[in-house]
């Protein structure tokens, strides 16, 4: 059955694509260190593609341009004390993107209390920059990509089931009309 005109991803695209990781931080060194620490990272035959934003405003634009980003590593304090939180709010409420995994990184943990932030902003993880070693960064990226992959898989399955239900309804409706006409 052909249910949609949308092109299907080929096996080659799935196996050889990249995982988009948006790095949002006003410190260029954080971008450089993150890219270096994850330079050889690979998950399911895909490498990471880094997209850098240095402000909340720039991050919002990049979220619009890359709705398929898997992860955002998000600093809290940039041009304002809550710029990162505003980006998180934008991602979930305005962009309506519940797929992307948001990892909040802060150099000032007291600025945004972890418990409140996780609850109020639909953040997936919260890390202090000082505790985020290369190994911990690897771990959080790996677990976030697994979550993202599973969310996308569930969403695709749900969409497939919706198409089957619609097609079944159409087939049943056509069969019922034929049966009615035949008397």
Where are these regions (language model features)?
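Active-site beta3 strand of CheY-like receiver
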Residues: 66-78
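Short hydrophobic/Thr-rich beta-strand motif most characteristic of the beta2 strand and flanking loop
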Residues: 42-57, 62
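Signal-transmission linkers at sensory-effector interfaces
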Residues: 23, 150-173, 177
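Hydrophobic/aromatic residues positioned on beta-strands within the core alpha/beta folds
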Residues: 103-106, 129
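Receiver (REC) domain switch/output surface
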Residues: 120, 136-149
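Non-catalytic signal-transmission and effector/linker regions of two-component phosphorelay proteins
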Residues: 1-22, 29-49, 68
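Short amphipathic alpha-helix used as the core "switch/output" element in two-component signaling
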Residues: 39-40, 58-62, 77, 82-101, ...
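Conserved sequence signature across two-component system core domains
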Residues: 24-25, 53, 59, 72
């Amino acid at each position: 059955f052909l249910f949609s005109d949308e092109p299907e991803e080929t096996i080659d695209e799935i196996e050889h694509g990249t995982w988009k990781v948006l790095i949002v931080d006003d410190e260029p060194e954080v971008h450089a260190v993150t890219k270096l620490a994850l330079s050889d990272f690979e998950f399911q035959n895909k490498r990471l593609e880094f997209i850098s934003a240095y402000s909340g405003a720039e991050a919002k634009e990049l979220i619009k341009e890359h709705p398929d980003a898997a992860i955002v590593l998000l600093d809290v304090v940039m041009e304002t004390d809550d710029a990162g939180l505003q980006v998180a709010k934008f991602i979930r409420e305005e962009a309506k993107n519940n797929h992307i995994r948001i990892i909040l990184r802060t150099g000032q943990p007291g600025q945004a209390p972890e418990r409140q932030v996780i609850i109020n902003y639909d953040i997936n993880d919260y890390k202090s920059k000082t505790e985020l070693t290369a190994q911990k960064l690897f771990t959080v990226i790996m677990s976030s990509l697994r979550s993202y992959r599973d969310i996308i898989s569930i969403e695709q399955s749900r969409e497939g089931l919706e198409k089957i239900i619609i097609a079944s309804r159409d087939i049943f409706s056509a069969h019922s009309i034929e049966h009615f006409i035949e008397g």
